[in-house]
Curated annotation (Swiss-Prot):
GO CC annotations, alphabetized: cytoplasm
Organism listed in the record: Yersinia enterocolitica
GO annotation terms (biological process): DNA-templated transcription
This protein's name: HTH-type transcriptional activator AmpR
Keywords, ordered alphabetically: Activator, Cytoplasm, DNA-binding, Transcription, Transcription regulation
Amino acid sequence: MVRSYIPLNSLRAFEAAARQLSFTKAAIELNVTHAAISQQVKALEQRLNCRLFIRISRGLVLTTEGENLLPILNDSFDRIADTLDRFSTGIIREKVRVGVVGTFATGYLLSRLRDFQQHSPHVDILLSTHNNRVDVVAEGLDYAIRYGNGALAWHESHFMYAPPLAQLCAPSISKRFTPPTDLQRFMLLGSYRAMNWSAWFAAAGGSVPSPSQQIMMFDSSVSMLEAAQAEIGIALAPPAMFMHLLRSERIIQPFSTTVSLGGYWLTRLQSRTETPAMRDFALWLLSEMKSEGE
Protein backbone atom coordinates (compact mmCIF):
# COMPACT_ATOMS: atom_id res chain seq x y z
CA MET A 1 0.00 0.00 0.00
CA VAL A 2 1.37 3.39 -1.02
CA ARG A 3 0.64 5.99 1.62
CA SER A 4 -0.32 9.51 0.70
CA TYR A 5 1.82 12.32 2.05
CA ILE A 6 1.44 12.64 5.84
CA PRO A 7 1.92 16.24 7.09
CA LEU A 8 3.53 15.34 10.41
CA ASN A 9 4.32 18.89 11.49
CA SER A 10 0.73 19.97 10.91
CA LEU A 11 -0.59 16.92 12.73
CA ARG A 12 1.69 17.58 15.72
CA ALA A 13 0.61 21.21 15.83
CA PHE A 14 -3.07 20.28 15.69
CA GLU A 15 -2.73 17.54 18.33
CA ALA A 16 -1.00 19.83 20.81
CA ALA A 17 -3.45 22.68 20.20
CA ALA A 18 -6.51 20.41 20.35
CA ARG A 19 -5.36 18.63 23.49
CA GLN A 20 -4.89 21.93 25.31
CA LEU A 21 -7.48 23.97 23.37
CA SER A 22 -4.86 26.68 23.03
CA PHE A 23 -2.50 27.72 20.24
CA THR A 24 -0.35 29.54 22.80
CA LYS A 25 0.14 26.46 25.00
CA ALA A 26 0.79 24.31 21.93
CA ALA A 27 3.48 26.76 20.78
CA ILE A 28 5.19 26.60 24.18
CA GLU A 29 5.05 22.79 24.22
CA LEU A 30 6.52 22.44 20.72
CA ASN A 31 8.95 25.36 21.16
CA VAL A 32 7.64 27.29 18.15
CA THR A 33 5.76 30.56 17.69
CA HIS A 34 2.01 31.06 17.99
CA ALA A 35 1.98 32.01 14.30
CA ALA A 36 3.67 28.73 13.36
CA ILE A 37 0.97 26.71 15.12
CA SER A 38 -1.76 28.77 13.44
CA GLN A 39 -0.18 28.28 10.00
CA GLN A 40 0.25 24.53 10.47
CA VAL A 41 -3.36 24.09 11.62
CA LYS A 42 -4.62 26.19 8.71
CA ALA A 43 -2.58 24.08 6.28
CA LEU A 44 -4.06 20.89 7.76
CA GLU A 45 -7.60 22.28 7.51
CA GLN A 46 -6.98 23.14 3.85
CA ARG A 47 -5.59 19.68 3.15
CA LEU A 48 -8.56 17.96 4.84
CA ASN A 49 -11.03 20.46 3.37
CA CYS A 50 -12.75 20.97 6.72
CA ARG A 51 -12.52 23.11 9.83
CA LEU A 52 -10.97 21.52 12.90
CA PHE A 53 -11.53 24.38 15.35
CA ILE A 54 -14.21 26.94 16.03
CA ARG A 55 -12.73 30.10 17.46
CA ILE A 56 -14.88 31.71 20.17
CA SER A 57 -14.32 34.61 22.56
CA ARG A 58 -13.16 32.27 25.34
CA GLY A 59 -10.75 30.27 23.20
CA LEU A 60 -11.09 27.22 20.96
CA VAL A 61 -13.73 24.54 20.49
CA LEU A 62 -13.19 21.41 18.42
CA THR A 63 -15.49 20.69 15.50
CA THR A 64 -16.87 17.18 15.01
CA GLU A 65 -14.01 16.49 12.59
CA GLY A 66 -11.50 17.74 15.15
CA GLU A 67 -13.00 15.56 17.88
CA ASN A 68 -12.75 12.52 15.60
CA LEU A 69 -9.14 13.22 14.65
CA LEU A 70 -7.71 14.06 18.09
CA PRO A 71 -8.01 10.63 19.81
CA ILE A 72 -6.47 8.94 16.76
CA LEU A 73 -3.48 11.27 16.90
CA ASN A 74 -3.21 10.95 20.69
CA ASP A 75 -3.00 7.20 20.35
CA SER A 76 -0.63 7.28 17.37
CA PHE A 77 1.86 9.71 18.93
CA ASP A 78 1.74 7.78 22.21
CA ARG A 79 2.54 4.56 20.38
CA ILE A 80 5.43 6.18 18.54
CA ALA A 81 6.83 7.63 21.78
CA ASP A 82 6.46 4.30 23.59
CA THR A 83 8.20 2.43 20.77
CA LEU A 84 11.11 4.88 20.77
CA ASP A 85 11.38 4.55 24.55
CA ARG A 86 11.40 0.79 24.19
CA PHE A 87 14.30 0.93 21.72
CA SER A 88 16.29 3.33 23.89
CA THR A 89 15.68 1.63 27.25
CA GLY A 90 14.85 -1.95 26.35
CA ILE A 91 11.80 -1.71 28.65
CA ILE A 92 8.31 -2.05 27.19
CA ARG A 93 5.98 0.33 29.02
CA GLU A 94 2.46 1.46 28.18
CA LYS A 95 0.38 4.34 29.51
CA VAL A 96 -3.31 4.58 30.32
CA ARG A 97 -4.82 8.01 30.92
CA VAL A 98 -7.75 7.82 33.33
CA GLY A 99 -9.98 10.67 34.45
CA VAL A 100 -12.02 9.97 37.56
CA VAL A 101 -14.55 11.85 39.66
CA GLY A 102 -12.91 12.84 42.95
CA THR A 103 -15.35 10.87 45.11
CA PHE A 104 -14.45 7.56 43.47
CA ALA A 105 -10.75 8.42 43.39
CA THR A 106 -10.45 9.09 47.13
CA GLY A 107 -13.11 6.63 48.24
CA TYR A 108 -12.00 3.60 46.23
CA LEU A 109 -9.45 3.78 43.43
CA LEU A 110 -6.34 5.37 44.96
CA SER A 111 -6.02 2.79 47.73
CA ARG A 112 -6.14 -0.04 45.18
CA LEU A 113 -3.84 1.21 42.42
CA ARG A 114 -0.90 -0.59 44.01
CA ASP A 115 -2.72 -3.86 43.33
CA PHE A 116 -2.98 -2.94 39.67
CA GLN A 117 0.71 -2.03 39.55
CA GLN A 118 1.53 -5.50 40.84
CA HIS A 119 -0.95 -7.01 38.39
CA SER A 120 0.41 -5.08 35.36
CA PRO A 121 3.87 -3.68 36.21
CA HIS A 122 4.45 -2.62 32.58
CA VAL A 123 1.50 -0.17 32.62
CA ASP A 124 1.73 3.39 33.93
CA ILE A 125 -1.55 4.98 35.04
CA LEU A 126 -1.80 8.73 34.45
CA LEU A 127 -4.62 9.78 36.76
CA SER A 128 -6.51 13.07 36.84
CA THR A 129 -9.57 14.03 38.85
CA HIS A 130 -12.52 15.84 37.32
CA ASN A 131 -16.26 16.32 37.58
CA ASN A 132 -18.84 14.57 35.42
CA ARG A 133 -18.56 17.19 32.70
CA VAL A 134 -14.97 16.38 31.77
CA ASP A 135 -14.03 16.78 28.08
CA VAL A 136 -12.34 13.45 27.37
CA VAL A 137 -11.20 14.60 23.93
CA ALA A 138 -9.52 17.77 25.13
CA GLU A 139 -7.95 15.93 28.08
CA GLY A 140 -6.77 13.06 25.88
CA LEU A 141 -8.27 10.48 28.25
CA ASP A 142 -8.43 6.78 27.50
CA TYR A 143 -11.12 6.26 30.15
CA ALA A 144 -13.33 8.48 32.28
CA ILE A 145 -14.98 7.21 35.45
CA ARG A 146 -18.25 9.09 35.93
CA TYR A 147 -21.31 9.05 38.16
CA GLY A 148 -24.78 8.78 36.65
CA ASN A 149 -26.76 6.35 34.51
CA GLY A 150 -24.06 5.57 31.96
CA ALA A 151 -26.03 7.05 29.05
CA LEU A 152 -23.43 8.99 27.06
CA ALA A 153 -23.54 9.57 23.32
CA TRP A 154 -20.66 8.03 21.34
CA HIS A 155 -19.33 6.28 24.46
CA GLU A 156 -19.00 2.69 25.55
CA SER A 157 -20.03 2.46 29.23
CA HIS A 158 -19.43 -0.35 31.73
CA PHE A 159 -21.37 -0.35 34.99
CA MET A 160 -19.20 -0.69 38.11
CA TYR A 161 -20.97 0.16 41.35
CA ALA A 162 -24.09 1.95 42.64
CA PRO A 163 -23.60 2.98 46.27
CA PRO A 164 -26.76 4.46 47.85
CA LEU A 165 -26.85 8.06 49.03
CA ALA A 166 -27.43 9.03 52.66
CA GLN A 167 -27.20 12.05 54.90
CA LEU A 168 -23.74 12.85 56.20
CA CYS A 169 -22.96 15.67 58.61
CA ALA A 170 -20.67 16.82 61.40
CA PRO A 171 -21.42 15.20 64.79
CA SER A 172 -22.13 18.61 66.31
CA ILE A 173 -24.94 19.25 63.80
CA SER A 174 -26.59 15.87 64.37
CA LYS A 175 -27.14 16.73 68.02
CA ARG A 176 -29.41 19.59 67.00
CA PHE A 177 -32.12 17.58 65.22
CA THR A 178 -33.97 14.27 65.55
CA PRO A 179 -36.64 13.45 62.94
CA PRO A 180 -36.03 14.12 59.23
CA THR A 181 -38.53 17.00 59.36
CA ASP A 182 -36.03 18.92 61.50
CA LEU A 183 -33.77 19.13 58.46
CA GLN A 184 -35.89 22.01 57.18
CA ARG A 185 -33.93 24.22 59.59
CA PHE A 186 -30.52 23.41 58.10
CA MET A 187 -28.61 24.17 54.94
CA LEU A 188 -28.73 21.18 52.58
CA LEU A 189 -25.61 20.35 50.57
CA GLY A 190 -25.88 18.65 47.21
CA SER A 191 -23.67 17.55 44.35
CA TYR A 192 -24.83 18.07 40.75
CA ARG A 193 -28.62 17.74 41.26
CA ALA A 194 -30.82 19.48 43.85
CA MET A 195 -33.59 16.98 43.04
CA ASN A 196 -31.58 14.25 44.81
CA TRP A 197 -32.70 15.75 48.10
CA SER A 198 -36.36 15.52 47.04
CA ALA A 199 -35.83 11.81 46.35
CA TRP A 200 -34.26 11.31 49.78
CA PHE A 201 -37.11 13.09 51.59
CA ALA A 202 -39.62 10.94 49.68
CA ALA A 203 -37.77 7.77 50.74
CA ALA A 204 -37.78 8.99 54.36
CA GLY A 205 -41.54 9.56 54.23
CA GLY A 206 -41.24 13.31 54.58
CA SER A 207 -42.14 16.26 52.41
CA VAL A 208 -39.78 17.66 49.83
CA PRO A 209 -37.59 20.62 50.82
CA SER A 210 -39.62 23.82 50.95
CA PRO A 211 -38.93 26.48 48.30
CA SER A 212 -37.47 28.71 51.02
CA GLN A 213 -34.95 26.11 52.21
CA GLN A 214 -31.38 26.82 51.21
CA ILE A 215 -29.56 24.21 49.12
CA MET A 216 -25.88 24.74 48.35
CA MET A 217 -24.72 22.87 45.25
CA PHE A 218 -21.18 21.61 44.54
CA ASP A 219 -19.59 20.18 41.41
CA SER A 220 -17.62 17.75 43.58
CA SER A 221 -18.78 15.51 46.41
CA VAL A 222 -15.31 15.80 47.94
CA SER A 223 -15.74 19.58 48.27
CA MET A 224 -19.26 19.02 49.57
CA LEU A 225 -17.97 16.80 52.39
CA GLU A 226 -15.38 19.43 53.28
CA ALA A 227 -18.29 21.83 53.77
CA ALA A 228 -20.16 19.24 55.85
CA GLN A 229 -17.15 18.79 58.15
CA ALA A 230 -17.01 22.57 58.52
CA GLU A 231 -20.61 22.45 59.84
CA ILE A 232 -21.96 24.46 56.90
CA GLY A 233 -24.80 22.01 56.37
CA ILE A 234 -25.92 18.43 55.79
CA ALA A 235 -24.59 16.55 52.76
CA LEU A 236 -26.25 13.90 50.62
CA ALA A 237 -23.50 11.53 49.51
CA PRO A 238 -22.58 7.82 49.30
CA PRO A 239 -21.27 6.69 52.74
CA ALA A 240 -19.32 3.87 51.05
CA MET A 241 -17.06 6.45 49.40
CA PHE A 242 -16.34 8.29 52.67
CA MET A 243 -15.67 5.45 55.10
CA HIS A 244 -12.41 7.07 56.22
CA LEU A 245 -14.38 10.08 57.48
CA LEU A 246 -17.03 7.90 59.11
CA ARG A 247 -14.46 5.71 60.87
CA SER A 248 -12.67 8.76 62.25
CA GLU A 249 -16.06 10.23 63.28
CA ARG A 250 -15.36 13.46 61.46
CA ILE A 251 -18.78 12.92 59.92
CA ILE A 252 -21.67 10.66 60.88
CA GLN A 253 -24.74 9.22 59.17
CA PRO A 254 -27.64 10.36 61.40
CA PHE A 255 -30.42 8.40 59.65
CA SER A 256 -30.50 4.92 58.11
CA THR A 257 -32.64 6.04 55.15
CA THR A 258 -30.82 5.77 51.82
CA VAL A 259 -31.76 6.35 48.20
CA SER A 260 -30.18 4.96 45.02
CA LEU A 261 -30.05 7.44 42.15
CA GLY A 262 -27.10 6.41 40.01
CA GLY A 263 -23.81 4.59 39.89
CA TYR A 264 -20.19 4.75 38.79
CA TRP A 265 -19.40 3.86 35.19
CA LEU A 266 -16.17 3.22 33.31
CA THR A 267 -16.58 5.05 29.99
CA ARG A 268 -14.56 5.21 26.79
CA LEU A 269 -15.12 7.08 23.55
CA GLN A 270 -16.10 4.58 20.87
CA SER A 271 -13.59 6.22 18.55
CA ARG A 272 -10.78 5.60 21.04
CA THR A 273 -8.81 2.52 19.99
CA GLU A 274 -8.50 0.15 22.94
CA THR A 275 -4.86 -0.78 23.56
CA PRO A 276 -3.73 -3.92 25.43
CA ALA A 277 -2.83 -1.73 28.43
CA MET A 278 -6.29 -0.14 28.40
CA ARG A 279 -7.85 -3.57 28.27
CA ASP A 280 -5.72 -4.73 31.21
CA PHE A 281 -6.86 -1.78 33.30
CA ALA A 282 -10.54 -2.16 32.40
CA LEU A 283 -10.61 -5.90 33.09
CA TRP A 284 -8.81 -5.43 36.41
CA LEU A 285 -11.08 -2.61 37.59
CA LEU A 286 -14.33 -4.30 36.53
CA SER A 287 -13.19 -7.52 38.23
CA GLU A 288 -12.39 -5.58 41.41
CA MET A 289 -15.80 -3.92 41.36
CA LYS A 290 -17.55 -7.25 40.78
CA SER A 291 -15.78 -8.70 43.81
CA GLU A 292 -16.78 -5.62 45.82
CA GLY A 293 -20.44 -6.24 45.05
CA GLU A 294 -20.41 -9.94 45.97
